[in-house]
């Protein structure tokens, strides 16, 4: 049983930030604010969402992209983090699983996801 004060606080936090609806298989572009010394900049990370887990303010999602030299890069983002400035759904994917960890072993065309019609 969760504390009702924590639930009330989380409910207020969830209402403050609007997050687009997306699920595993969708290609998303996440704009992350990065602080280097006294400077801040926004870095985009675009890839396929392979997992969404947790609930409430602790909800996280994992994005995987293929970087330079065909090396896979995965980042786990807290959904309601203050460092995330924007999440944009680039395209919707058609998958039959909620966790797409099998994409880690796939290379090239085998790692593609069909587009939702």
UniProtKB/Swiss-Prot annotation:
It comes from the Bacteria. Pfam families: Ribosomal_L19. GO terms for cellular component: cytosolic large ribosomal subunit. Transmembrane segments: none annotated. GO terms for biological process: translation. InterPro entries: Ribosomal_bL19, Ribosomal_bL19_CS, Ribosomal_bL19_sf, Translation_prot_SH3-like_sf. One of its GO terms (molecular function) is structural constituent of ribosome. The keyword Ribosomal protein applies. Keywords: Ribonucleoprotein, Ribosomal protein. NCBIfam families: rplS_bact (TIGR01024). This protein is located at the 30S-50S ribosomal subunit interface and may play a role in the structure and function of the aminoacyl-tRNA binding site. Belongs to the bacterial ribosomal protein bL19 family. This is Large ribosomal subunit protein bL19. It comes from Nitratiruptor sp. (strain SB155-2). The lineage of its organism: Bacteria, Pseudomonadati, Campylobacterota, Epsilonproteobacteria, Nautiliales. The gene is rplS.
